[in-house]
């Protein structure tokens, strides 16, 4: 049995297909969703979503925060930004992570430290998505 997964970002629908299972990063940790999951509204952290398609292949996308609504075998995920891991080059993601860590190590002041921390988190998420983790 399967359920519908829709990922929507400001630039359009990023994903819209049936899935057997998803694993996503909420503000309180990772959760798994299967068919007939109880209704749920949750905030999403910067992190990956793993989608097991009907052919048992796993797809990983980088999500940059938002929220998810699970109801009646439909998972609607609305995020500020999303990127399919298959479209992310691992080498570029690794370089971005190294640059973000360098920025984090030299950041001065609360605002810069918070921005640097978020940059590291985004870069780590993109790298994980590129590696289908």
Swiss-Prot record:
Q: Name one GO molecular function term.
A: proton-transporting ATP synthase activity, rotational mechanism
Keyword entries, A-Z: ATP synthesis, CF(1), Chloroplast, Hydrogen ion transport, Ion transport, Membrane, Plastid, Thylakoid, Transport
Q: Which SUPFAM superfamilies match?
A: Epsilon subunit of F1F0-ATP synthase N-terminal domain
Q: Which stretches are transmembrane?
A: none
Which GO cellular component does the record give, naming just one?
A: chloroplast thylakoid membrane
User: Where is it localised?
Assistant: Plastid, Chloroplast thylakoid membrane
Xref: Gene3D superfamilies:
6.10.140.480, F0F1 ATP synthase delta/epsilon subunit, N-terminal
Any coiled-coil regions, as ranges: none
**Protein topology in the membrane:** Peripheral membrane protein
Q: State the family it belongs to.
A: Belongs to the ATPase epsilon chain family.
Fill in the subunit field for this protein: F-type ATPases have 2 components, CF(1) - the catalytic core - and CF(0) - the membrane proton channel. CF(1) has five subunits: alpha(3), beta(3), gamma(1), delta(1), epsilon(1). CF(0) has three main subunits: a, b and c.
PANTHER family recorded = ATP SYNTHASE DELTA/EPSILON CHAIN, ATP SYNTHASE EPSILON CHAIN, CHLOROPLASTIC
**General function of this protein:** Produces ATP from ADP in the presence of a proton gradient across the membrane.
Q: Can you name this protein?
A: ATP synthase epsilon chain, chloroplastic
Q: Gene behind this chain? A: atpE
């Amino acid at each position: 049995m399967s359920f519908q997964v829709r990922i929507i970002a400001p630039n359009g629908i990023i994903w819209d297909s049936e899935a057997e299972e998803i694993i996503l990063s909420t503000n309180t940790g990772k959760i798994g969703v299967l068919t007939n999951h109880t209704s749920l509204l949750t905030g999403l952290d910067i992190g990956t979503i793993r989608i097991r398609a009907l052919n048992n292949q796993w797809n990983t996308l980088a999500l940059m925060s938002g929220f998810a609504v699970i109801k009646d075998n439909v998972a609607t995920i609305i995020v500020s930004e999303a990127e399919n891991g298959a479209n992310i080059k691992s080498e570029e993601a690794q370089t971005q992570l190294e640059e973000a860590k360098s920025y984090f190590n030299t950041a001065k002041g609360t605002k810069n430290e918070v921005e640097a921390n978020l940059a590291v988190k985004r870069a780590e998420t993109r790298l994980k998505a590129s590696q289908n983790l």
